[in-house]
């Protein structure tokens, strides 16, 4: 191993940026983390062991990658910025079980990538990422839509988004994203991260969120998962409006349809005037199923 300071130290980060002439790119939402304690705490929160395969999304200059390499069996780092690939390959060269590829995770065939790039694809697959704020939700949705069974997804994100992921019904943060996560995973905020530990410093603080597969199955299953979440997004399209007004936007104002919607709400004992954020995931599934039975969805 090299005697150089760890990549995540502020001095080494600045040295790497100077050596390679790196300027962070706003278009990729780049902010480099420069606090070794935070980096080590992320690895701990993700519960990385030598038996794990880790996919890291957006390694930047390799600060978190280095910490993951010291704990995991293998690390596959997906970096969208082609200019950083030679930098990563050089600074991470002391680690044999790290592979860096130029890849947009949203365009990746994740099952194929796992099969092709890991020496032992049968080991638990964990995702660890410092996600660009502007694309956090699409990346999370992409991971959850994948057929891969993730052992853990541990991501750094804007604190406000983290609060939405872990929100409870009836709160202003609760919404379609909360429900999409809850459908498959259990979410918890591991710890907050100050904006001051990044180069350059972002405008907001961050939080580390850990997602693990649900241990208790949903008591009711949707007639169609994709249609369920299209329906839920429609119900949250106008948050200040009642469920009834949102339902009319989703289903229409045809008198026959309105009569069926009224009957369904009565049957499920849901007030038409309730706000969508008051409904639980189970209630949304029951409502979608009942509307489907009436040929409204």
UniProtKB/Swiss-Prot annotation:
<dbReference type="GO" id="GO:0003723">
    <property type="term" value="F:RNA binding"/>
</dbReference>
<protein>
    <recommendedName>
        <fullName>Ribosomal RNA small subunit methyltransferase A</fullName>
        <ecNumber>2.1.1.182</ecNumber>
    </recommendedName>
</protein>
<dbReference type="InterPro" id="IPR020596">
    <property type="entry name" value="rRNA_Ade_Mease_Trfase_CS"/>
</dbReference>
<keyword id="KW-0963">Cytoplasm</keyword>
<feature type="binding site">
    <location>
        <position position="79"/>
    </location>
    <ligand>
        <name>S-adenosyl-L-methionine</name>
    </ligand>
</feature>
<dbReference type="GO" id="GO:0005829">
    <property type="term" value="C:cytosol"/>
</dbReference>
<dbReference type="InterPro" id="IPR020598">
    <property type="entry name" value="rRNA_Ade_methylase_Trfase_N"/>
</dbReference>
<feature type="binding site">
    <location>
        <position position="130"/>
    </location>
    <ligand>
        <name>S-adenosyl-L-methionine</name>
    </ligand>
</feature>
<dbReference type="InterPro" id="IPR029063">
    <property type="entry name" value="SAM-dependent_MTases_sf"/>
</dbReference>
<comment type="similarity">
    <text>Belongs to the class I-like SAM-binding methyltransferase superfamily. rRNA adenine N(6)-methyltransferase family. RsmA subfamily.</text>
</comment>
<keyword id="KW-0694">RNA-binding</keyword>
<keyword id="KW-0949">S-adenosyl-L-methionine</keyword>
<comment type="function">
    <text>Specifically dimethylates two adjacent adenosines (A1518 and A1519) in the loop of a conserved hairpin near the 3'-end of 16S rRNA in the 30S particle. May play a critical role in biogenesis of 30S subunits.</text>
</comment>
<keyword id="KW-0808">Transferase</keyword>
<keyword id="KW-0489">Methyltransferase</keyword>
<dbReference type="GO" id="GO:0052908">
    <property type="term" value="F:16S rRNA (adenine(1518)-N(6)/adenine(1519)-N(6))-dimethyltransferase activity"/>
</dbReference>
<dbReference type="InterPro" id="IPR023165">
    <property type="entry name" value="rRNA_Ade_diMease-like_C"/>
</dbReference>
<dbReference type="InterPro" id="IPR001737">
    <property type="entry name" value="KsgA/Erm"/>
</dbReference>
<dbReference type="InterPro" id="IPR011530">
    <property type="entry name" value="rRNA_adenine_dimethylase"/>
</dbReference>
<dbReference type="Pfam" id="PF00398">
    <property type="entry name" value="RrnaAD"/>
</dbReference>
<feature type="binding site">
    <location>
        <position position="31"/>
    </location>
    <ligand>
        <name>S-adenosyl-L-methionine</name>
    </ligand>
</feature>
<feature type="binding site">
    <location>
        <position position="104"/>
    </location>
    <ligand>
        <name>S-adenosyl-L-methionine</name>
    </ligand>
</feature>
<feature type="binding site">
    <location>
        <position position="58"/>
    </location>
    <ligand>
        <name>S-adenosyl-L-methionine</name>
    </ligand>
</feature>
<feature type="binding site">
    <location>
        <position position="33"/>
    </location>
    <ligand>
        <name>S-adenosyl-L-methionine</name>
    </ligand>
</feature>
<keyword id="KW-0698">rRNA processing</keyword>
């Amino acid at each position: 191993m090299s005697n150089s300071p760890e990549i995540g130290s502020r001095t080494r980060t600045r040295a790497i940026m100077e050596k390679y002439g790196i300027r962070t790119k706003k278009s990729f939402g780049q902010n480099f983390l420069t606090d070794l304690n935070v980096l080590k705490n992320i690895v701990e929160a993700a519960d990385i062991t030598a038996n794990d395969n880790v996919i890291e999304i957006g390694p930047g200059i390799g600060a978190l990658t280095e910490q993951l390499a010291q704990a995991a069996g293998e690390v596959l780092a997906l970096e969208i910025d082609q200019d950083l690939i030679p930098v990563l390959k050089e600074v991470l060269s002391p680690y044999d079980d790290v592979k860096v590829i130029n890849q947009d995770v949203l365009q990746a065939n994740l099952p194929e990538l796992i099969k092709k790039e890991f020496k032992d694809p049968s080991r638990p697959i964990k995702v660890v990422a410092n996600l660009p704020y502007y694309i956090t939700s699409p990346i999370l949705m992409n991971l959850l839509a994948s057929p891969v069974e993730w052992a853990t997804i541990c991501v750094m994100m804007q604190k406000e988004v983290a609060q939405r992921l872990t929100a409870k019904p009836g709160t202003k943060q609760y919404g379609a994203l909360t429900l999409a996560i809850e459908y498959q995973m259990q979410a918890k905020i591991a710890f907050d991260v100050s904006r001051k530990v990044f180069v350059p410093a972002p405008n907001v603080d961050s939080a580390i969120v850990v997602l693990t597969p649900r241990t208790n199955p949903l008591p009711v299953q949707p007639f169609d998962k994709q249609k369920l979440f299209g329906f839920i997004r429609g119900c949250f399209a106008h948050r200040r409006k009642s469920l009834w007004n949102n339902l009319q936007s989703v289903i229409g104002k045809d008198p026959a349809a309105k009569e069926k919607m009224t009957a369904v709400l009565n049957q499920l004992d849901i007030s038409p005037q309730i706000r969508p954020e008051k409904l639980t995931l189970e209630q949304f599934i029951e409502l979608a199923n009942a509307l489907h039975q009436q040929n409204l969805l």
